[in-house]
């Protein structure tokens, strides 16, 4: 047992949390990382680490914008969003969250010691509280405000 890589155990535990909580996102993400780790694909970890967040944000953005692309949300509805107070509030909150996310990326790059706690908290939130794994960026942004760093 002393030859077991601790990161494998962490990924297995997190995959188990995903299974127990019926959270397919966490389960699949951990299995994906386990497969990469224990196969020759592990040579691509630097690429996944470097571009994974960008690719994830790209896929999330595509998913969010698809209703506009398909016409389910019309151009008129988009324009009308500037006339409704709830939509204007949503726009303002979107701006704030984007700003927090940018601060979060900066904090995670400049203070890598914060990453582990943010990731564990996010996975627990996703696995146990049905959260969505966009949390690390926003959490890091909020943390940067609290600790005065970016």
From Swiss-Prot:
UniProtKB keywords: Cell membrane, Membrane, Transmembrane, Transmembrane helix
Membrane topology term: Multi-pass membrane protein
One GO location term (cellular component): plasma membrane
Top-rank taxon: Bacteria
InterPro entries: UPF0756_TM
Coiled coil segments of this chain: none
UniProt family annotation: Belongs to the UPF0756 family.
HAMAP family in the record: UPF0756
Protein name: UPF0756 membrane protein PMI1560
Species name: Proteus mirabilis (strain HI4320)
């Amino acid at each position: 047992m002393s030859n077991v890589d601790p990161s494998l155990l962490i990924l297995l535990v997190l995959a188990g949390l995903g299974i127990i909580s019926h959270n397919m996102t966490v389960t699949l993400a951990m299995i994906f990382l386990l497969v990469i780790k224990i196969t020759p694909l592990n040579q691509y970890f630097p690429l996944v680490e470097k571009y994974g967040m960008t690719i994830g944000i790209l896929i999330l953005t595509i998913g969010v914008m698809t209703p506009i692309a398909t016409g389910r949300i019309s151009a008129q509805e988009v324009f009308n969003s500037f006339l409704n107070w709830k939509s204007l509030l949503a726009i303002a909150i979107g701006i704030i969250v984007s700003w927090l996310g940018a601060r979060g990326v900066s904090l995670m790059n400049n203070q890598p010691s914060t990453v582990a706690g943010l990731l564990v908290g996010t996975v627990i939130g996703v696995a146990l509280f049905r959260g969505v794994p966009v949390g690390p960026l926003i959490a890091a942004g909020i943390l940067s405000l609290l600790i005065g760093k970016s």
